[in-house]
UniProtKB/Swiss-Prot annotation:
In the resting state, through the dimerization of its C-terminal domain, HSP90 forms a homodimer which is defined as the open conformation. Upon ATP-binding, the N-terminal domain undergoes significant conformational changes and comes in contact to form an active closed conformation. After HSP90 finishes its chaperoning tasks of assisting the proper folding, stabilization and activation of client proteins under the active state, ATP molecule is hydrolyzed to ADP which then dissociates from HSP90 and directs the protein back to the resting state. NCBIfam families: PRK05218.1. The modification Phosphothreonine is found at T297, T479. Residues 222-270, 696-724 are annotated as: Disordered. Induction: By heat shock. HAMAP family: HSP90 (MF_00505). The lineage of its organism: Eukaryota, Metazoa, Chordata, Craniata, Vertebrata. It comes from Homo sapiens (Human). The gene is HSP90AB1. This is Heat shock protein HSP 90-beta. PANTHER family: HEAT SHOCK PROTEIN 90 FAMILY MEMBER (PTHR11528). Residues 215-552 are annotated as: Interaction with AHSA1. Monomer. Homodimer. Forms a complex with CDK6 and CDC37. Interacts with UNC45A; binding to UNC45A involves 2 UNC45A monomers per HSP90AB1 dimer. Interacts with CHORDC1. Interacts with DNAJC7. Interacts with FKBP4. May interact with NWD1. Interacts with SGTA. Interacts with HSF1 in an ATP-dependent manner. Interacts with MET; the interaction suppresses MET kinase activity. Interacts with ERBB2 in an ATP-dependent manner; the interaction suppresses ERBB2 kinase activity. Interacts with HIF1A, KEAP1 and RHOBTB2. Interacts with STUB1 and SMAD3. Interacts with XPO1 and AHSA1. Interacts with BIRC2. The modification N6-malonyllysine is found at K399. The modification N6-acetyllysine is found at K435, K481, K624. The modification N6-methylated lysine is found at K531, K574.
Length: 724
């Protein structure tokens, strides 16, 4: 039961704060928070909510506004009293509202917010839990709330946060309707009485509130008056009540006296200082996203972008749109000119899209609004449908947000397509953000087709320019059924690769994919415009053939069948199979991977991963196929040698050497590069005519490894080693 204290006619009731609220206030007061300024945002936001409510009620009953037509928020600093006052003409609170809302009934968010705070959440999230009012105690030692609701008398709530608060009927100056919050600031928080600081905080957090926020400041100005007027003013001053602050205060700051000889004397004048109340509206700029896009200049968009992002460069492109119907929201999205250096830094909190609800700022890093691959997009989304006290947990479940997200992604893709029409600007965009588009193809199955239209690659026919897959398809030959591509480390490397020899000789265009993310991208992008994407480095490459070519291929298969079997026996588990190649022209052999295995480039990328999964590595790397070129003299001579004696040790050694060299030229790495190097050195010595025995005699201590015998000579000492 509340205690009742009688002060003459006035009845003061004292209430204890509900336990959780008392705990929250204690946490706010006794913990150091660096960003105390958010209290002003919360109080302005509460005022805006109250104004929203009365505006909504007045739609059905206009008489609700009889107690005050103007919907506004006033901020009044008073350095003499050390108070900061916020006044709104919103709906106000009844006595019951005051008692329930400000102390005795804990909001569902109170406990959740305390848990979040103790887990390291930022104090600025307080408003998302519906307990923003208590942030006033970040800066105030005592708070007085005077409020008037249309259905009740004017009441005053007061608390110094000592575990209790008082409520009494207020017979002071009538406020008509609304709420006045008076903060008695702590000694070290007087910065919030300064004009500069208040303006800075309002601009940062509340410049887009839908009601005028006016700052009232007492200022001084000089005024020149005659002596007669000064005497009159002085007489009036003596009569007036000392407490009336609105009358000008007069100080004598000197007089200009003229020579008053004779009767023709001039009036004397004095300069006085008078105090006056200066009013300044702090949020004159109507939120740019609420205006008609046709009325906004590129300069205005540019200024807004810079103030939003702190970028010193102009944006590259902008999309301004609104969605109406069952769901209402407005959005203003920008593409920056450059990618930030930490674009893919997962742990860093991105401040990409600011979320507003009915012009009230909610949060500036809303991950749920946009997929990760579009994390470079900057802008503002203002929803009419989300609740103002939405928390991150609620956002994750919000169906409204899912619809907003879908629309934002759609509009971003529209913006990219529009930008693609301007080749110069699209080139800048693609250099900065191509990885994001490719990540999108990997992650976003719904928009994969639209994203694939935005890709640009160098090809075997594009020269220095990059080309789109649509342009590639338009240049395809009649007999060509697939889009051919190769992945690798650089344009030069893939252009000189053995894999593209036959394809290019036939006049087919090959797409060069040279970024690591391309490997992940093509795993998901199986086809484009009805044409399948085929890697020229994987098994099963089918090139259009005429009857003569088919016949020749069958003959080669029969002719080299025994050699293929022998090579498979020699290489054993190193390869899955050995086949005749239809892709080689000038190279004797190459290593291709199975359709679902990793390419050489992908294997290189995966080996570079610090936290790789070795079990997957073994499985995905095992599928290598050796393809031999039946038209190459090395392969033909090897066939003849094998036909003559399939147990010839030289054949085995040469097969291993061919395989290892093919591994290197196909982009793979060797498991034992030293053994391969020693073989090559031995061949160099033979080529230079250096006698192995001489080298051994000169270096008696440097024993030549037994497992690397010479390539030529007698049968006992002239064979290359056999590698297991």
């Amino acid at each position: 039961m509340p205690e009742e204290v009688h002060h003459g006619e006035e009845e003061v009731e004292t209430f204890a704060f509900q336990a959780e609220i008392a705990q929250l206030m204690s946490l706010i007061i006794n913990t150091f928070y660096s960003n105390k300024e958010i209290f002003l945002r919360e109080l302005i936001s509460n005022a805006s909510d109250a104004l929203d409510k009365i505006r909504y009620e007045s739609l059905t009953d206009p008489s609700k506004l009889d107690s005050g037509k103007e919907l506004k928020i006033d901020i009044i600093p008073n350095p003499q009293e050390r108070t900061l006052t916020l006044v709104d003409t919103g709906i106000g609170m009844t006595k019951a509202d005051l008692i329930n809302n400000l102390g005795t009934i804990a909001k569902s968010g109170t406990k959740a917010f305390m848990e979040a705070l103790q887990a390291g959440a930022d104090i600025s999230m307080i408003g998302q839990f519906g307990v923003g009012f208590y942030s006033a105690y970040l800066v105030a030692e005592k708070v007085v709330v005077i409020t008037k609701h249309n259905d009740d008398e004017q009441y005053a709530w007061e608390s110094s946060a000592g575990g209790s608060f008082t409520v009494r009927a207020d017979h002071g100056e009538p406020i008509g309707r609304g709420t006045k919050v008076i903060l008695h600031l702590k000694e070290d928080q007087t910065e919030y009485l300064e004009e500069r600081r208040v303006k800075e905080v309002v601009k940062k957090h509340s410049q887009f509130i839908g009601y005028p926020i006016t700052l009232y400041l007492e200022k001084e100005r000089e005024k020149e008056i005659s002596d007669d007027e000064a005497e009159e003013e002085k007489g009036e001053k003596e009569e007036e009540d000392k407490d009336d602050e609105e009358k000008p205060k007069i100080e004598d700051v000197g007089s200009d006296e003229e020579d008053d000889s004779g009767k023709d004397k001039k009036k004397k004048t004095k300069k006085i200082k008078e105090k006056y109340i200066d009013q300044e509206e702090l949020n004159k700029t109507k939120p740019i996203w609420t205006r008609n896009p046709d009325d906004i200049t590129q300069e205005e968009y540019g200024e807004f972008y810079k103030s939003l992002t702190n970028d010193w460069e102009d944006h590259l492109a902008v999309k301004h749109f609104s969605v109406e119907g069952q769901l209402e929201f407005r959005a203003l999205l920008f593409i920056p000119r450059r990618a930030p250096f930490d674009l893919f830094e997962n742990k860093k909190k991105k401040n990409n899209i600011k979320l507003y609800v009915r012009r009230v700022f909610i949060m500036d890093s809303c991950d749920e609004l946009i997929p990760e691959y579009l994390n470079f997009i900057r802008g503002v989304v203002d929803s009419e449908d989300l609740p103002l006290n939405i928390s991150r947990e609620m956002l994750q479940q919000s169906k409204i947000l899912k619809v907003i997200r879908k629309n934002i992604v759609k509009k971003c893709l529209e913006l990219f397509s529009e930008l693609a029409e301007d080749k110069e600007n699209y080139k800048k965009f693609y250099e900065a953000f191509s990885k994001n588009l490719k990540l999108g193809i990997h992650e976003d199955s719904t928009n994969r087709r639209r994203l694939s239209e935005l890709l640009r690659y160098h090809t075997s026919q594009s020269g220095d320019e990059m080309t789109s897959l649509s342009e590639y398809v338009s240049r395809m030959k009649e007999t060509q059924k697939s889009i051919y591509y190769i992945t690798g480390e650089s344009k030069e490397q893939v252009a000189n690769s053995a894999f593209v020899e036959r394809v290019r000789k036939r006049g087919f265009e090959v797409v060069y994919m040279t970024e690591p993310i391309d490997e992940y991208c093509v795993q998901q992008l199986k086809e484009f415009d009805g044409k399948s994407l085929v890697s020229v480095t994987k098994e099963g490459l089918e090139l259009p053939e005429d009857e003569e070519e088919k016949k020749k291929m069958e003959e080669s298969k029969a002719k080299f069948e025994n050699l293929c079997k022998l090579m498979k026996e020699i290489l054993d588990k190193k390869v899955e199979k050995v086949t005749i190649s239809n892709r080689l022209v000038s190279s004797p052999c190459c290593i291709v991977t199975s359709t679902y295995g990793w390419t050489a480039n992908m294997e290189r990328i995966m080996k570079a991963q610090a936290l790789r999964d070795n079990s997957t590595m073994g499985y995905m790397m095992a599928k290598k196929h050796l393809e031999i070129n039946p038209d190459h003299p090395i392969v033909e001579t090897l066939r003849q040698k094998a036909e003559a004696d399939k147990n010839d040790k030289a054949v085995k050694d040469l097969v291993v050497l061919l395989f290892e060299t093919a591994l290197l030229s196909s982009g793979f790495s060797l498991e034992d590069p030293q053994t391969h190097s020693n073989r090559i050195y031995r061949m160099i010595k033979l080529g230079l005519g250096i006698d192995e025995d001489e080298v051994a005699a000169e270096e008696p201590n440097a024993a030549v490894p037994d497992e690397i015998p010479p390539l030529e000579g007698d049968e006992d000492a002239s064979r290359m080693e056999e590698v297991d």
